[in-house]
């Protein structure tokens, strides 16, 4: 394969992996440990 194609595939996989990890952190099991600043400062 050409170098440009390999770089494109690598960057695409990296982007998909980062997006998947961000969604898992936001909505998956680790989200229970996240703090909510709006709930901490209710008036």
Swiss-Prot record:
Keywords: Chloroplast, Membrane, Plastid, Thylakoid, Transmembrane, Transmembrane helix. It is found in: Plastid, Chloroplast thylakoid membrane. GO terms for cellular component: chloroplast thylakoid membrane. The chain crosses the membrane at residues 5-27. It is a single-pass membrane protein. It comes from the Eukaryota. GO terms for biological process: photosynthesis. InterPro entries: PSII_PsbN. May play a role in photosystem I and II biogenesis. Belongs to the PsbN family. This is Protein PsbN. It comes from Spirogyra maxima. The lineage of its organism: Eukaryota, Viridiplantae, Streptophyta, Zygnematophyceae, Zygnematophycidae. The gene is psbN.
């Amino acid at each position: 394969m050409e170098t440009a194609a390999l770089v494109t595939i690598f960057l695409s996989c990296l982007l998909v992996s980062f997006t998947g990890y961000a969604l898992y952190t936001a909505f998956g099991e680790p989200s229970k440990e996240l703090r909510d600043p709006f709930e901490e400062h209710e008036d």
